[in-house]
From Swiss-Prot:
A biological-process GO annotation: tRNA threonylcarbamoyladenosine modification
This protein's name: tRNA N6-adenosine threonylcarbamoyltransferase
Family named by the database record: Belongs to the KAE1 / TsaD family.
UniProt binding sites for Fe cation: H111, H115, D300
Localization (cell): Cytoplasm
Pfam family, one: TsaD
Function statement: Required for the formation of a threonylcarbamoyl group on adenosine at position 37 (t(6)A37) in tRNAs that read codons beginning with adenine. Is involved in the transfer of the threonylcarbamoyl moiety of threonylcarbamoyl-AMP (TC-AMP) to the N6 group of A37, together with TsaE and TsaB. TsaD likely plays a direct catalytic role in this reaction.
Cofactor binding notes: Binds 1 Fe(2+) ion per subunit.
Gene that specifies this protein: tsaD
PANTHER family cross-referenced by the UniProt entry: TRNA N6-ADENOSINE THREONYLCARBAMOYLTRANSFERASE, TRNA N6-ADENOSINE THREONYLCARBAMOYLTRANSFERASE, MITOCHONDRIAL
Keywords: Acyltransferase, Cytoplasm, Iron, Metal-binding, Transferase, tRNA processing
PROSITE patterns cross-referenced by the UniProt entry: GLYCOPROTEASE
Amino acid sequence: MRVLGIETSCDETGIAVYDDELGLLSHTLYSQVKLHADYGGVVPELASRDHVRKIVPLIRQALKDANTEMADLDGIAYTKGPGLIGALLVGACVGRSLAFAWDKPAIGVHHMEGHLLAPMLEDDAPEFPFVALLVSGGHSMLVKVDGIGRYEVLGESVDDAAGEAFDKTAKLMGLDYPGGPRLAKLAAKGLPAGYKFPRPMTDRPGLDFSFSGLKTFTANTIAAEPDDEQTRANIARAFEEAVVDTLAIKCRRALKQTGYNRLVIAGGVSANTRLRETLAEMMNSLGGQVFYPRGEFCTDNGAMIAFSGLQRLKAGQYEDLAVKGQPRWPLDTLPPVA
């Protein structure tokens, strides 16, 4: 089976072609970072309009790169949600229209299921069951995964997601958009400076996250300290260590609770070097394994949507002709793949 994947949930237009026998045949991506940089964040209306401009040329390029004609496709997968409703509708309209015109089945894919399954695009793919840590700009959650569509959300953020906390803290430090990667780069220059940042919600039972208080603590620390480059780097390091330690503590709890010894990390924040190193050390000490996608598949992309959609289309799951976007969509409401 060969599937065209379309990702337009936020500020990246991702198109890919995936074949269940040959693997990933093509992958094209357009990022809107420069478009939104002057605003310090994503402007939904601008994002939607840019998707409209870029999506068709990218589809043509992906099909050309995959040496694939319309007749070679067996289905179309597009991101249905969660995400920005205007951006989602661009991908949904194009995906559904192509499916109708080409007489192909189509399915709307859950964006976070795409991230969760992204490590399966790698040669060293995880086997079920496992615990997944999904960390991005909009989501932070721990999920018990027993199969595709067999998900139990063990914990999630009650306020700011980890990626959102990175971006907002970067803005407090005067770093340009996108702030998360820039803060991590600054933190790499930091030294242990004796800052005692809290590890939120680790002093109580449970697997939920909360990062808004940590952001406020960082803001107060910035205001009380000298405004020089090394001090800012030291504060960035302390903040990053606090976020990573918090995520690691909750991952360890989730693994103990489930009895699983495989951990998947995915989403934009999974590209963070300190997070990867910390979780790798933790899993090594526990005698387990950690899996994550390559850097280009940590952020939003069409490959993960094509792969996820293919799994469901193969199982006979597809949707009617209605164009649907679902900005809020609980992960654990998805049907299982038999």
